[in-house]
Amino acid sequence: MQKLIAIEGIDGSGKTTLANLLKEHLESKMKLNVIVTREPFSEDIIKLIEKIGWNDPILLVLLFAADREIHVNWLSKIKDADLIILDRYYFSSIAYQGALGVDEQWIKMVNSYFPKPDMVILLDLPIEVAISRIKNDKFNFEEKIKSLAKVREKYLKLAKEYNFYVVDASKDKNEVLEQAIKIIQKNLF
């Protein structure tokens, strides 16, 4: 499989924006063939999660792992890409479902069969900034702040454990892109 970069971060951190900007930059400036994908990936699994999964964090771990298996199987068939950028990967399960109280070691074990990314970029920002970016979503404001704070804490712990590259995502999207490009050029190409 080609080089894999996972972009992680709490809701509203700018993962999708960065993934798309990186693709554009790396294809035009470095002449790389870049594929961007995101999780959840499978429409069937997404429908199942929406129907039965959100209230059961253990079921969520398993459904996201099933989705990831479909995703990774699809990725393994791509032969002409130099780089695959993943907008979320298994670290999201560890952070989000771990924040809901699911045993992190079990989540890691469930996801241990998936390819390790060559690099993980964690987009970190204060909860208030993330909330302001996703304010159009329908959610209980107080609950969302509490849950995102727990998830952010999990991500920062994972960053130390797995040597993520942490980028300040509260900055302008072009500054975030510039930081990410420097990290990629220095450490991957």
Curated annotation (Swiss-Prot):
Reaction(s) catalysed by this chain's protein: dTMP + ATP = dTDP + ADP
Annotated positions binding ATP: G9, I10, D11, G12, S13, G14, K15, T16
MF terms in GO: ATP binding; dTMP kinase activity
E.C. no: 2.7.4.9
GO cellular component: cytoplasm
GO biological process, one term: dTDP biosynthetic process
Top-rank taxon: Archaea
Record bears the keyword Nucleotide-binding: yes
Keywords carried by this UniProt record: ATP-binding, Kinase, Nucleotide biosynthesis, Nucleotide-binding, Transferase
Gene3D superfamilies: P-loop containing nucleotide triphosphate hydrolases
PANTHER family: THYMIDYLATE KINASE (PTHR10344), UMP-CMP KINASE 2, MITOCHONDRIAL (PTHR10344:SF4)
Family: Belongs to the thymidylate kinase family.
Protein known as: Probable thymidylate kinase 1
Highest classification ranks of the organism: Archaea, Thermoproteota, Thermoprotei, Sulfolobales, Sulfolobaceae
Name of the coding gene: tmk1
